[in-house]
Amino acid sequence: MKKIAVLGGGMMGSAIAIDLSLSYAVEVIDLKENKKFSGRLKQLNIKTALADLTDFKLTAHLIKEADLIIGAVPGYIGFKVLKNAIKAGKNIVDISFFSENPFQLNEMAERKNLTAVVDCGVSPGLSNLILGYHNKKMKVEFYECLVGGLPFRRSLPFEYSASFSPIDVIEEYTRPARLMENGKIVVKPPLSELENLEIEPIGTLECFNTDGLRTILKTMLIPNMKEKTLRYPGHINKIKFLTDCGFFNSESVKINGNSIRPIDFAAKILLPIWKQEKNQDEFTFMKIIIRGKEKGKPKEHIYELFDRYDKKTGTTSMARTTGYTCTGAAKLILEEKFLKKGICPPEYIGEDENCFKEIMNHLASRNIKLKHIERDI
């Protein structure tokens, strides 16, 4: 039986480990035990270990028997963990939301004859997969992705609960958003171009620019592309207030002789406020719009994903949609169906029609289904 080491045992990492344990021998490695998820892992006889994942020698020792690595750590250490896995000579599928350019590691991965799939969540991830598939079949001229995970129950003040690492949520709110307009990369302020839209079956949500295009700015030669994140109306005004007051600044300030970064303080305060309640009913929604010319005719493809908390398994919709996209890619590598070497964002997988269909079927078998509308324009 092939062995997989999952680096990171939080909400996403544990969901990934549980899914992969159905077919493989899995071990979860993290800095400290996450009691919220570790009990379930032990019930399923999934091995766990504690380690500083930024320590190369220690990590390399722990993963030396693994056939594949899963990177599921917070973004601020994600790039280093990815680099360490490649340095250790391991294929990897990574979901971490790090700010660094993953293609910096392409030469090392190619030299070691490794496959390193990055940004392999829901968005970026599944969204890239879909775009890569259609970009191979048509001349895409416009791409837009709207995505968000929210609780059904709206509770003030934020009407939000973090479906992944809170520090990564803050990073999403503070990182300048890169868009493609008329063939040129344009950098816009985070949270900019706020607009309302109607989402079935939820109702009115607001959306704003976020830096989710990432690798497709380099890999997809499409003149107009943007990604926006969804929240309940009014949420972003509260985030902007905190931003304007300096709570998300990363430069240290002195308080009673102690140095502290405002962003670390804010994350500490917001963590319990944004913490998901046990068995909280929540949903993930994603809408993708692709326009261009297919076989010489103007065509539009619209995909809609609506997934909600799985009461039977206790798995959140964000963990399902992110995690099972990741496990689908992992199976392709382990079964030697996706063989490209180097840094491989999900759009590369989507360009292979068989691989695209395999992952879509993998998701459908886990009751994650996308509605696809195709029409002439």
Predicted regions and their residues:
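Rossmann-fold NAD(P)-binding glycine/threonine-rich loop
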Residues: 96-116
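NAD(P)-binding Rossmann-fold cofactor-contacting core
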Residues: 26-40
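Conserved Rossmann-fold cofactor-binding substructure of NAD(P)-dependent oxidoreductases
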Residues: 54-64
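N-terminal Rossmann-like NAD(P) cofactor-binding module of classical short-chain dehydrogenase/reductase
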Residues: 63, 67-72, 92-94
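C-terminal catalytic/substrate-binding lobe primarily of soluble NAD(P)-dependent oxidoreductases
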Residues: 136-377
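Hydrophobic/small residue at the entry helix of a nucleotide-binding pocket
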Residues: 12
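ADP-ribose/adenylate-binding Rossmann-like module
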Residues: 84-102
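Conserved N-terminal Rossmann-fold NAD(P)-binding element of oxidoreductases
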Residues: 4-8
